[in-house]
């Protein structure tokens, strides 16, 4: 579902919050029952880089699991949007494991094992053909 709302190429003086899924792979596996708890617990105990490599190996080994995990990202993003009554006008961009929301309060950020956390806050966004530039008072991020 990765998509950017290009209706507004420059957003100025708005509250834009990046809502990121914490430990996305393992939390989605747990929420949707994609792996046994024992496997998920083992993965969750690993450092992030090792966990990502291990999940990648699981996905290469089991194509059905890989497809289910990829679909789970779309499902949980849609659930987050529906539950919080977000329309496309409220969205700046949707990434694999994050939603950039402008000027809209979030009422529910936890869905079982899946936790959306406010990772970054910005005031301005410039959407270019190949880049998204997010600007706050403290920093500039290019996505």
PLM features per residue range, with description:
Residues 1-143:
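Conserved acidic
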